[in-house]
Amino acid sequence: VAGTNPLVALFSTVSLGFMAAAFGGRPGVMSGASGACSVVVAALAASHGTGYLSACVILAGMLQCLSGALDLGKFIRLVPHPVMLGFVNGLAVVMTRAQLSHFMDGSGKLLLNTQGYIMWGLTALTMALIKLIPKVTTKLPPSLGAIFVVGSLVKLLKIPAVTLASIAGADTFTGGLSVIPKLRLPAVPVSLATLKTIFPYAAVMAAVGLIESLLTVQLVDGMLDDGKKGSTKKECIGQGIGNIFSGILGGQGGCALVGQSIINVESGG
């Protein structure tokens, strides 16, 4: 979505996730490259290149750190519970619709052929394992266990399943570690014109990222009955540091992720 190499996006998730977890305000919250943030900066990346994208991410991180220093995150508690439920349910609908496209052909019709039946079957098996694994052991995250079992079956039995390479292209991950950018400031002119170009995108990205992150903190607070409340101030600063670090590495930034945080908490993370 943001116009970066998939490996860069993955590394961006690793760097952002590590820094946000280290400096954030709530254990259990998972952060990474976010579709919501990527949509905001996609136009900037397309028109000015990835250098301006990285500069935008760094500036967004600075704005998030400033929001944390001013303790602006506390206002997220004014969001009523029904709004938070609508946010989570809406996200579930969006995620489901995004996944359903992989079960359709080019004309938008469901795949009702051999390939489709294999995909439906593997999906059903994965969902069943996610429910069954916790009944057998609690030491293995059910989602990870299901992926490992189903992936192993596909490999061992040579099941002709659709893979990421077959959808995105065989050369999607070509380049390996050499594709990952080095730690350096983005190569953009340090001028008022550059600031005028990236500031509107950075401000929106910072706001969208903090809203999703702080709502995720509230959601995790409700799921974990440990008597603790996440610190909105620390979460703002943690997200900001994560985005600054991600931008310096040439990443696309991101925020806390509701779906991944739910999976993490339910898996005992």
Residue ranges and their predicted role:
Residues 1-269:
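Transmembrane helical cores of multi-pass ion-transport proteins
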